[in-house]
Amino acid sequence: MNVQGFHHLAIQVKALEDVAGFYREVLGLPEIERHHGDDGRLRSIWLDVGGGGFLALERVEVAPSPDPGFRDGRPGIFLVALRIARADRARIRAELDRRGIPLVHETRWTMYVRDPEGNRVALSHHPDG
């Protein structure tokens, strides 16, 4: 086997447009594709994360789980970590504050937020600096 890198991560969400808006407008990920089901309804939105990988947001009909806290101990995907430049950290933090998006955790390398459905998102410059 020869894994060549990260291809994509898919997250199931109920409010597809709202969640896609967070990743597009707040985090600046460019939208690259939209897919519709046989019924014509929007099924998924793909966003470019750079390096050839993408984030696929997939519509589901169930509501998101309540906020379990930063570390909930459940199996499964813990978070989506996106790389930022260390030099951009203060600007990104100010933009999150301006938009009213609270940090749920912070380390010297990473800021953690939640998307509109509660998925953990890490904005990290580790090991840069």
Residue positions per predicted region:
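Histidine-centered active-site/metal-ligand motif
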Residues: 7-8, 44, 55, 79
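Short, charged/polar surface micro-motifs in flexible loops or helix N-caps
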Residues: 50-55, 61-64, 87-89
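Core segments of cupin and vicinal oxygen chelate
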Residues: 12-54
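Residue-level structural signal for beta-strand termini and adjacent loop
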Residues: 37, 60, 124-126
